[in-house]
C-alpha cells in the first residue's frame, strides 16, 4: 500500500512536506483518536499552517461521511450517511445490556451480487467505498462518544469484492489510529474465494463469517448467484484451509426462509456438509438467523419453534449452533434490510 493512499498517509506526507518534525503527525493522530476532535481547526496544538493545509485538503471535519437520517430503537441505531459525491450508505450501531457496543458497517454503495433474500442487492451496485469512507463510518460513532468494542463488515456490499477492504482493516488495526484488535473485527462474505485466501495470509486473527443459506449447490445457486462462480464445495475447502492455517473458528450464517431451506432434509444436509471434514471441524459454528422481511423481497419469516427444531437437529449431530438474537428489525436495521431508502 502506498503511504499516501489513505488520508492518514496523506496527513503524514503533509507534515513532511511542510518540513515539520515527525511528532506533529503523532499529535494529530492523538487529537483524533485520544481526544476525539473532529474539527481540524480545533486541534490547537498543531501549527496554524498545518491546520490550514488539513482543512484545504480534507475539509473542516476529519470524518468525511455526513449523517442525513437516523432511526433509533431500544438497542439499535441506524445511520444513513451521505458521501462527498452524493452517494449514500447505511451503518448500524448496536448496544447490548452488558454495555458492549458493536457496529455493522458498509463496504460498498449497494451490491451487485443479487442474493434474492437481501434488500441491499435490489438497489444494484453503485461503487466501492474507499478505505477512508469505510473507516469514517466508525469515526462518526467514535466522535459521538461510542465505544468501538466490535466491528462487523455486514452492512451494504460484499467486503471481499472491494480492493480497499484490506487498507481499511490496516487502518482499524493500526495501534496509532483506531488500535483495534483483529479479533474484534468480523468480515462476512458470500464466498469470494480469493478474498478469503488473502484474509488468511494478511489478517489471520480477523473473524470470518460465511453466508451459507443452503447446503445444496443448485438451490444455493438459485438463492445466491455467486455460487455458480464459486461453488459451495470449493468455498468449503478454502474455509478448511483458513481454519487449518489460523486455528480460528469460522461462523456460518444461515438465514431461515420458510418453505425454502428450513426442512429436516436441509438440516441433515448441513450436518453432512460439516461432519467428517477433519480434526478442525469443531471450529465451524452455525449461526441461524430469523429472516427479516422487507418490501424488496418475498420470503416469509420462519416460526421460532421451527428454527429451534432446526437448531436441535444440528446440535444432536454434534454441530455447534445457536440462534442469533436480532436487534433493529423494527427500524429495518437487521440482517438483509439495509437499502438506503430513508431521507429527511
From Swiss-Prot:
S-adenosyl-L-methionine binds at residues 157-158, 188, 211-213, 292. Binds 1 [4Fe-4S] cluster. The cluster is coordinated with 3 cysteines and an exchangeable S-adenosyl-L-methionine. One of its GO terms (biological process) is tRNA methylation. InterPro entries: Aldolase_TIM (IPR013785), Methyltransferase_A (IPR040072), rRNA_lsu_MeTfrase_Cfr (IPR022881), rRNA_lsu_MTrfase_RlmN/Cfr (IPR004383), rSAM (IPR007197). Residues 97-330 form the Radical SAM core domain. Its EC number is 2.1.1.224. Pfam families: Radical_SAM (PF04055). Its main location: cytoplasm. It comes from the Bacteria. It catalyses: adenosine(2503) in 23S rRNA + 2 reduced [2Fe-2S]-[ferredoxin] + 2 S-adenosyl-L-methionine = 8-methyladenosine(2503) in 23S rRNA + 5'-deoxyadenosine + L-methionine + 2 oxidized [2Fe-2S]-[ferredoxin] + S-adenosyl-L-homocysteine. Specifically methylates position 8 of adenine 2503 in 23S rRNA. Confers resistance to some classes of antibiotics. Belongs to the radical SAM superfamily. RlmN family. Cfr subfamily. Reaction proceeds by a ping-pong mechanism involving intermediate methylation of a conserved cysteine residue. This is Ribosomal RNA large subunit methyltransferase Cfr.
Amino acid at each position: 500500500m502506498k503511504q499516501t493512499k489513505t488520508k492518514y498517509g496523506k496527513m503524514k506526507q503533509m507534515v513532511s512536506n511542510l518540513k515539520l518534525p515527525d511528532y506533529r503527525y503523532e499529535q494529530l493522530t492523538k487529537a483524533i483518536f485520544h481526544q476525539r476532535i473532529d474539527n481540524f481547526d480545533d486541534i490547537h496544538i498543531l501549527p496554524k499552517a498545518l491546520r490550514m493545509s488539513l482543512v484545504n485538503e480534507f475539509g473542516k471535519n476529519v470524518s468525511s461521511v455526513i449523517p442525513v437520517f437516523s432511526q433509533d430503537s431500544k438497542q439499535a441505531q441506524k445511520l444513513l450517511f451521505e458521501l462527498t459525491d452524493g452517494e449514500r450508505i447505511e451503518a448500524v450501531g448496536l448496544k447490548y445490556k452488558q454495555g458492549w457496543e458493536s457496529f455493522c458497517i458498509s463496504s460498498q454503495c449497494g451490491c451487485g451480487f443479487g442474493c434474492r433474500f437481501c434488500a441491499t442487492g435490489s438497489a444494484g451496485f453503485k461503487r466501492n467505498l474507499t478505505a477512508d469512507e469505510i473507516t469514517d463510518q466508525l469515526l462518526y460513532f467514535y466522535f459521538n462518544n461510542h465505544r468501538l468494542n466490535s466491528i462487523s463488515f455486514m452492512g451494504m456490499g460484499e467486503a471481499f469484492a472491494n480492493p480497499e477492504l484490506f487498507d481499511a482493516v490496516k487502518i482499524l488495526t493500526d495501534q496509532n489510529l483506531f488500535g483495534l484488535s483483529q479479533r474484534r473485527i468480523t468480515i462476512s462474505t458470500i464466498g469470494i474465494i480469493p478474498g478469503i485466501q488473502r484474509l488468511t495470509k494478511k489478517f489471520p486473527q480477523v473473524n470470518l463469517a460465511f453466508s451459507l443459506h443452503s447446503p445444496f449447490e443448485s438451490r444455493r445457486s438459485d438463492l445466491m448467484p455467486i455460487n455458480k462462480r464459486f461453488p459451495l464445495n470449493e468455498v468449503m475447502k478454502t474455509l478448511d484451509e483458513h481454519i487449518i492455517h489460523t486455528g480460528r473458528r469460522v461462523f456460518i450464517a444461515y438465514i431461515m426462509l420458510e418453505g425454502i431451506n428450513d426442512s429436516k432434509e436441509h438440516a441433515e444436509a448441513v450436518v453432512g456438509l460439516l461432519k467428517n471434514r477433519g480434526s478442525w471441524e469443531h471450529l465451524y459454528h452455525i449461526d441461524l438467523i430469523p429472516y427479516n422481511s422487507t418490501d424488496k423481497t418475498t420470503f416469509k419469516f420462519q416460526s421460532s419453534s421451527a428454527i429451534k427444531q432446526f437448531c436441535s437437529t444440528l446440535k444432536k449431530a454434534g454441530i455447534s449452533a445457536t440462534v442469533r438474537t436480532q436487534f433493529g428489525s423494527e427500524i429495518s436495521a437487521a440482517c438483509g434490510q439495509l437499502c438506503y431508502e430513508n431521507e429527511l
